[in-house]
């Protein structure tokens, strides 16, 4: 899967995309992450990407021109893509939506910033997604959340289909308690059923939890 990210702050993604599972998926050629700095597409001499809002209001609004030109350029290859904008008014991301997005061959994610995005630019996108009812500085962190939860659903990224199926929310259930070594620690013991070797009993215990 290819994921293009349109952002004013591409440097925010370097640590996330170059660590852990996402880095391994990138190196293995399973995922293809591409960062696009919206400022590079500004027609302004000073690379401006925002301006005051018509009708007043607090804060600046992202202008449509840099977004349109950036989008136009990265879609020149003709490959179809699902265009997503991170915005507080969008659908709240959950595991069902993540699975839906994981079925796409390519995603393009626009990170909102400032007071919002010019509605003419928003109209170019297929979907609007939020990660919750709270205020963030910009859309970069929501984009990271989308990238992470969608990527781990792509076959081969986790290395095992069972890893994906066992995780919290995969079947509408939260994950069961996990234990590691040692058997006893500070007077706290691992449940006996987990040490029994009886896989059927373990499975029932996990489901009950």
For the regions a language model picked out, list residue spans one by one.
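N-terminal nucleotide/polyanion-binding subdomain common to many enzyme families
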Residues: 1-74, 195, 200-207
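Long, charged alpha-helical interface segments
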Residues: 169-209
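S-adenosyl-L-methionine/SAH cofactor-binding core of RNA-modifying enzymes
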Residues: 63-111, 118
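Short clusters of hydrophobic/aromatic residues that line enzyme substrate/ligand-binding pockets
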Residues: 49, 54, 93, 101, ...
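Hydrophobic/aromatic beta-strand patches that form the interior of the parallel beta-sheet core
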Residues: 4-6, 34-36, 82-84, 107-108, ...
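Structured adenosyl-cofactor binding patch, chiefly the S-adenosyl-L-methionine
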Residues: 117-169
């Amino acid at each position: 899967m290819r994921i293009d990210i349109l952002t004013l702050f591409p440097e925010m993604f370097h640590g996330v995309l170059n660590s852990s599972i996402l880095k391994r998926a990138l190196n293995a050629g399973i995922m293809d992450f591409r960062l696009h700095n919206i400022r590079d597409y500004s027609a302004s001499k000073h690379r401006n990407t925002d301006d005051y809002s018509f009708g007043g209001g607090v804060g600046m609004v992202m202008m449509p021109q840099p977004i349109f030109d950036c989008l136009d350029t990265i879609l020149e290859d003709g490959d179809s893509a699902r265009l997503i904008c991170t915005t507080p008014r969008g659908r709240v991301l959950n595991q069902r939506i993540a699975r839906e997005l994981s079925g796409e061959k390519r995603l393009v994610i626009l990170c909102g910033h400032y007071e919002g995005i010019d509605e003419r630019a928003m109209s170019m996108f297929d979907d609007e997604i939020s990660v919750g009812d709270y205020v963030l500085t910009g859309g970069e962190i929501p984009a990271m959340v989308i990238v992470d939860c969608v990527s781990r659903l792509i076959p081969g990224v986790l290395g095992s289909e069972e890893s994906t199926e066992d995780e919290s929310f995969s079947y509408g259930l939260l994950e069961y308690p996990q234990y590691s070594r040692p058997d006893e620690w500070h007077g706290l013991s691992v449940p006996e059923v987990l040490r029994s070797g009886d896989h059927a009993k373990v499975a029932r215990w996990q489901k009950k939890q």
